[in-house]
Amino acid sequence: MQRKRILIADAHPTMMAGVRLLLRDRFEVILMVADEPSLRDAVESGQFDLVIADLSVPISSGENVPRLIKKLDPELRFVILSVHDEPAVVDECLAAGAKGLVLKRTAVDDLVPAVDAVLAGKVYVSPSIQT
């Protein structure tokens, strides 16, 4: 079976490297990007099954990351990584099209289950922030 292709977008190289380590045994991490132009190019290439993106990647248009990804490829599934656990942030990400939201502080435990759930067509929110 072909491994699912993952794009990681985060402005912090150390975080991207950690995410890659968490996923490398089960998924093919094809590309890691750190800025909006690279994220745009990668999403528009259509070569990914899933995107894992930091909510805080700066977007010049003022849009947030989930809205940008959804606008670029409405069918692409994606998981948002965030340090924010406020319900309003979760609601905004899900309303914008994210299928998963994982807190950075719980990514070691939550990221692989989130990716599995989202690839299976489900929604995943880190258990520590579910209301």
Residue ranges and their predicted role:
Residues A88-A95, K99-T131:
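Short, flexible helix-to-coil linker/hinge segments that flank and couple to helix-turn-helix
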Residues H12, L55-S56:
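The short loop immediately C-terminal to the conserved phospho-acceptor aspartate in CheY-like receiver
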Residues D54-L55, S82:
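Active-site residues of response regulator receiver
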Residues D35, S61-N64:
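Acidic catalytic/metal-coordinating carboxylates
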Residues A11, L81-D85, K104-T106:
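Conserved active-site segment of CheY-like receiver
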Residues P13-L31:
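Two-component/phosphorelay signaling modules centered on CheY-like receiver
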Residues L7, F27-P37, A42:
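Short hydrophobic/Thr-rich beta-strand motif most characteristic of the beta2 strand and flanking loop
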Residues E63-E75:
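Short amphipathic alpha-helix used as the core "switch/output" element in two-component signaling
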